[in-house]
Amino acid sequence: MKWLKRLTVIVGTFYRYRLAGLCASLMGSGWICALLKMMPQSSKLKNEPPAVRLRLALESLGPIFIKFGQVLSTRPDLIPHDYAVELAKLQDKVPPFDARLSREQIEKSLGQSIEKLYAEFETEPIASASIAQVHKARLHSGERVAVKVLRPNLLPLIEQDLSLMRFGAAWVERLFSDGRRLKPLEVVAEFDKYLHDELDLMREAANAGQLGRNFHNSNMLIVPKVFYDYCTSDVLTIEWMDGTPVADIAKLKADGIDLHKLADYGVEIFFTQVFRDGFFHADMHPGNILVAADNRYIALDFGIVGTLTDYDKRYLAINFLAFFNRDYRRVATAHIESGWVPADTRAEELEAAVRAVCEPVFNKPISQISFGLVLMRLFEVSRRFNVEIQPQLVLLQKTLLNIEGLGRQLDPDLDLWKTAKPFLVKWMNGQVGPKALWRNLKNEAPDWAQIIPSLPRKISALIDENRQQEMRDAYIHLVKVQQRQSLWLAVIAVVLLLILLLK
């Protein structure tokens, strides 16, 4: 009955932070919403804005709900802007767990004692969060490493909270008129995947390895080496990196770091990941970035990454180029062509809505325009038009906001458009023309070589399948007709019988 106890805690928090009225206002109208507004509410925090009360409630419910709020903050297509801003303030910081448990977890996962695994191992963790904590160590070969270890017995607690979230999301969709638009089950499913990805440290090791290969010998970014022999799904051993936290501007200046070049590097690294690699570090907040003495960035924490298809890249390139040319008609048609917009959407209405939210942004000097803000405004319009925004693009928008904020902290005069435009134009030019056509033909040739010989057989099978389906449909239709006829015959027989009896 642990789930019942936990549910009681959640409902109590719901009352204590006056969230009944908030839910009613977010969910639209209907008798359920009216009932929620009539519920008695705690007098506590009555003067605080609803978004603040929601953040405080999630903080009080613990690490899993804090992470849920962080994920929700990246969905401006689903929640109002002020809620997204407030939930972004949630901090995932918890006290470290017992060092003895940490040692036991490492030894159990790697199958050897700490002494055999590491020449030195610092018992006191250097960082701690809700999912894992990090210890400093040294391998017997001499390399200094960071050892990340998952909190023990975490999975049952996560599954319990996720089950309750799924239960609540299902009822929200059933009971509230606006429930489907908010897509609660989709949000919880996305959060479920996000959490389970973070719980697999072998996946994080693979992410770090991929990013390291993409930026091998880069003059802009250092990615720590992964020691795969010391990694499992519960333990990650990665190269220890020395550097200055990127947010420590005073120290960077004192060390003679070129802040202007560093800001440009950040933007260039981001767009290289997006348009060259289609694979990007999606958690690039200042806490995960150091700066080396040679003016290069050092990336940390690879638990969250995003991947982009050529279709996603095309969507981004078309929209950014159209935005900065103020071609809002092209933005609208790009969304309709994507198939993410309801079929009955009128391009003129979408164009007018995009113009209304974006024109004020583009009234500023181009060096002051925020790419991340442009995407956020676009997602806000999407919410009104029920556009299906892809999760990887939401991750990208959050990452872009982080990169922009960081870049302008280093260099207030940073011109993102100047750095980004060559990437966009180069990528778009690479998608059209004879060279692009020849490249695509070469890429597709092996598939066509396999498909063409079997094409007649597959076409024949498809025709047969269609015929069989037509026969099945005809049979079902015939059965339904016979059932209706039988029903009417039975009704007529009953009516005739009643007439005879009444005589």
UniProtKB/Swiss-Prot annotation:
The answer to whether the entry has keyword Cytoplasm is no
Which amino acids does the record list as binding ATP? 126-134, 148
User: EC number(s) per UniProt?
Assistant: 2.7.-.-
Protein location: Cell inner membrane
Q: Which residues form a coiled coil?
A: none
> What's a GO biological-process term for it?
ubiquinone biosynthetic process
Annotated TM spans? 13-35, 485-502
Q: Which residues form the signal peptide?
A: none
The segment(s) forming the Protein kinase domain are 120-491
**From which domain of life does this come?**
Bacteria
Q: Could you tell me the keywords of this UniProt record?
A: ATP-binding, Cell inner membrane, Cell membrane, Kinase, Membrane, Nucleotide-binding, Transferase, Transmembrane, Transmembrane helix, Ubiquinone biosynthesis
Q: Which residues form the active site?
A: 283
Pathway given in the UniProt record: Cofactor biosynthesis; ubiquinone biosynthesis [regulation]
Q: How does it sit in the membrane?
A: Multi-pass membrane protein
Recorded GO cellular component terms are: plasma membrane
Query: One GO MF term, please?
Result: protein kinase activity
- Family membership, please give it: Belongs to the ABC1 family. UbiB subfamily.
Report the NCBIfam families cross-referenced here.
PRK04750.1 (NF003404), UbiB (TIGR01982)
The protein here is known as: Probable protein kinase UbiB
Name the source organism: Neisseria meningitidis serogroup A / serotype 4A (strain DSM 15465 / Z2491)
